[in-house]
Amino acid sequence: AWRFMPQDFRMRSLYGAIEDSTLEDWPITYDDLEPYYEQAEYEIGVSGDVTPNIFQGPRKKPLPMPPMVPKSREYEILKPAAERLGLHPFDLPFLINSVPYNGRSACMRIRWCVGFACETDAKNGTHNTVIPRALVTRNCLLRTECVVKEVMVDDRGKATGVAFFDENDRLQEQPADIVVVSCGATESARLLLMSKSKLFPEGLGNRHDWVGRNLQGHSYTGAIGYFPEDVDTYDDIGPGACVAACDYNHDNPGLAGGGMLCNEFIRLPIQFIGNLPRDTPRWGLAHKAAMRRYYQHNIGVKGPTQEIPAWDARVQLDPVVRDYWGLPVVRLSGGIHPHTLDLGNHQAARAADWLREAGADFVEERRAGPGLTGHQHQAGTCRMGSDPKTSVVDPWHRVHDVDNVFVVDASVHVTNGGFNPVLTIMALAFRAGEHIAQEWQGGGLR
């Protein structure tokens, strides 16, 4: 549950233009978003201790919950090693209850965490916080198992609602005075592109061909350290990741941006296979022997590299392939920007340094490679900006072409930081929601 750094909102001003990139500053700043970061941390629930992180932006309050205890063996190995290197390690912020909070119990620290449902409901998200609270008000209705076909508009260019397939695959219409699109970076772009009409033949917000472009994700690079002794990598203290450093998010010589580094989440044996030494046979007795040798003798350090946006990295509608409902599926195109590869390889080398200092016998880097952009944490396809010619939504998330349609998710990110963007998505949602409510109450959206 990371806040972006102040520098992440002004990448173009800090680093200048990058060839073949659409790198730009956000139209808002960290200071604009700080109150909503705090709101997200307290309303959703974040644990940890980020006080030692000297690189973070100003904050008015500490996190609402302390870091999780007890500490794992990896923490005991990695934290002093980072300090010896002159880094500034600290406990990760998590959307997990370290103590009972908001009527739900604390984390049990089991290893089956990432990718699994929480047995104690201690993992925090909208599903067990703001959505249930909204339903209790009886002022909203939650429709599940539905698929939106298009945002409908009238002859004046004003949205009138959405057409959608219900849980029984029947096409229905939901009238609305305000439409908020929050489908994620690929699907929000897809929905706007599918919402074609006489006034908007290329889709909503796409008058200048920006919908779907600037697709970004996070390339995770790092290193695996193999230790002579049993480092209790899997000591059943979940979720695994516990210590991080932000020393390489910015100020890397010759590079724009960077990313956070931390140890990995607990990996089940089937997940660990990809982290065996590269010369390990992929099957047979030798493979089993390597699993026994390395499974509890390794530590992984990696992190999300900030991707450099590019015009050709994009979401489009596939001209041929249709889904179950006959709608065009998403087609992704555009490779990872070369500068992102350089950033990723720099991060991998720094992770290797950390592991060697921690006492690893040998280390293998997991370096960046070319390929399709938009890996984990997709963002950027409905860029926020003040100029309708170079963005899709304004600084308040309103689609430039349609004054009662808002896009509120990671697709509005101008850049995607060197962190998991979930807290930024939540903070932006609180900010946008407040603005929409104020506009409605003032009569501006009626």
Q: Which residues are covered by each model-predicted region?
A:
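FAD cofactor-binding and catalytic pocket of flavoenzymes
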Residues: 1-21, 26-31, 36, 85, ...
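A glycine-rich dinucleotide-binding beta-alpha-beta segment and adjacent secondary-structure elements
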Residues: 90-95, 106-114, 149-154, 158, ...
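A short acidic-Thr-Gly-centered motif at the start of a beta-strand
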Residues: 130-136, 168-173, 384, 390-400
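Glycine-rich loop(s) and the adjacent beta-strand/alpha-helix scaffold that form part
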Residues: 137, 146, 150-154, 162-236, ...
